[in-house]
From Swiss-Prot:
Gene3D superfamilies: MFS general substrate transporter like domains, Multidrug resistance protein D
Protein's recorded name: Lincomycin resistance protein LmrB
Organismal lineage: Bacteria, Bacillati, Bacillota, Bacilli, Bacillales
Transmembrane segments: 15-34, 55-77, 82-104, 111-131, 141-163, 170-187, 202-224, 231-253, 268-290, 297-319, 329-351, 358-380, 445-467
GO cellular component: a single term: plasma membrane
Originating organism: Listeria innocua serovar 6a (strain ATCC BAA-680 / CLIP 11262)
Length: 471
């Protein structure tokens, strides 16, 4: 931990983390808030559902491309400079989106927003590692977890309220003042805590990283809609896979790599990465499956579906500071192993949901699942990063955040693929093709997709048995 900022003044951790919390909350809120407005946007801009999905795909793609090179940016620019740049991009993107008269302009706004988020998240994690001692990092990461889990959870519900009374533009207008406040607060309190070393920039590594991570994220993001056999998906995953292979080979053979893969020599970091990867797959697949189930099988309106999922999301966020303090006191094993056990139980019962399952049952199961995941996510991530030496913090945070984006794309794509296959298999044996059969087939497909989540949770539980407090 650093006691002084690079300018010599004493570090004040609380105002620094408060700046990140404000900016991060709005950035992650806007990421999911727009999901509720997609059907409205199809009507407003007279576009297809495939086109409107680019608002999500484009956002994820930008994160997948920029987050891997964030480790380099953290070593080239000061903490204050990167913070102001990130929040400025978020403000600019939000303003462009709010004023958008066309879908193309809205798409540009979303990409600019994503640039801000891609810069902010790794900077936030890296700064916490630098300003908090190891025995307090769990609590600090817990506060960050509150934002990362809570903001996306309340996004759909708040946007549902906005859409009932105002137009979709107000999702962005309401976010704008809070981003400006975060920028002004940061101007006063943000301090430079990282050392600017300005390592050599390897252009080829950046190109390979962009093609590799961008290709993989795009392929999985497109697979759910276009199918795994489409030329777009196949070309993207082949190009992405080859580029990733070349990227890894180049990083291992360079004296000063863009992304230092020596982090994988630290077993608790690698294990933490695997556990976070699995957790994100479970979260993102659940976030795509349950709204489909609630709106189609239970015939709930979008706003009502958002309310059903709100308690679980809020609990997940509120649990993060609590699990952070428990991590500082008892280490990772006391949280991660029980967390996966809770997740396995919740997912087992989610595989058994039917057309007649009550909304209350879904609220309980979703809440239990979110509690389990909150016991895994931040403790596993913090424990893994704790094992790294300070010089590898930028690379560790970049890799951790990159794999989260990739796991989210993979989890969503696999869940949709399994669900679609389950629907098709059910309809092949169904008597007739009426509305009741369509609803029953969707429910059967969602059951199958939750089996995938259950298998991932069981794998996570087995892996968690090897976790130890990082030294």
């Amino acid at each position: 931990m650093q006691q002084e900022a690079t300018g010599g003044q004493k570090i004040r951790p609380i105002p620094i983390i408060a700046s990140f919390l404000m900016a991060g909350f709005i950035g992650l809120f806007s990421e999911t808030a727009l999901n509720m407005a997609l059907s409205d946007l199809i009507q407003v801009f007279d576009i297809s559902s495939a086109t409107v999905q680019w608002l999500t795909t484009g956002y994820l793609l930008t994160l997948g491309i920029l987050v891997p090179i964030s480790g380099l940016l953290l070593q080239w620019f000061t903490t204050r400079g990167l913070f102001f740049t990130a929040v400025s991009f978020s403000i600019a993107g939000t303003l462009i989106a709010a004023l958008s008269p066309t879908f193309a302009m809205l798409m540009i706004g979303r990409v600019v927003q994503a640039v801000g988020t891609a810069l902010l998240l790794p900077l936030m994690f890296n700064t916490i590692l630098l300003i908090f001692p190891e025995h307090k990092r769990g609590s600090a990461m817990g506060m960050i977890g509150l934002v990362i889990m809570f903001a996306p959870a309340v996004g759909p519900t708040i946007s549902g309220l906005i859409l009932e009374n105002l137009t979709w533009n107000w999702i962005f207008w309401i976010s704008l003042p809070f981003l400006i406040i975060a920028l002004l607060f940061g101007m006063k309190f943000m301090q430079n805590v990282s050392v600017v070393t300005k390592p050599k920039i390897d252009i080829l590594s950046i190109i390979l990283s962009t093609l590799g991570f961008g290709g993989v994220v795009f392929a999985f993001s497109s697979a759910g809609e276009n199918g795994w056999g489409s030329a777009t998906v196949l070309v993207s995953i082949i190009v992405g896979g080859i580029a990733l292979g070349l990227f890894v080979w180049r990083q291992l053979t360079m004296e000063k790599p863009l992304m230092d893969l020596k982090v994988f020599k630290y077993p608790m970091f690698t294990l933490g990465l695997i556990l976070v990867f699995i957790s994100f797959m479970m979260i993102l697949s659940t976030m795509i499956l349950l709204p489909l189930y609630l709106q189609n099988s239970l015939a709930l309106a979008a706003f009502s579906a958002g309310l059903v999922l709100l308690p679980g999301g809020v609990l997940n966020g509120l649990m993060s500071p609590f699990t952070g303090r428990l991590f500082d006191a008892y280490g990772p094993r006391a949280l991660v192993i029980p967390g996966f056990i809770v997740a396995v139980i919740a997912l087992f019962f989610l595989t058994r949901i039917e057309v007649g399952t009550s909304a209350l049952t879904i609220i309980v199961l979703h809440s239990v699942l979110m509690i389990g995941i909150s016991m895994v996510m931040m403790p596993a991530q913090t424990n893994g990063l704790n094992q790294l030496p300070p010089k590898l913090y930028p690379d560790g945070t970049a890799i951790m955040n990159t794999l989260q984006q990739v796991s989210g794309a993979i989890g969503t794509a696999v869940a949709i693929t399994i669900m679609s296959a389950g629907q098709k298999a059910y309809m092949e044996t169904a008597q007739g093709v009426g509305p009741e059969q369509m609803i029953a087939s969707l429910t059967a497909g969602i059951q199958n997709a939750f089996v995938f989540g259950l298998i991932m949770a069981c794998i996570g539980l087995l892996c968690s048995l090897f976790i130890r407090k990082a030294k």
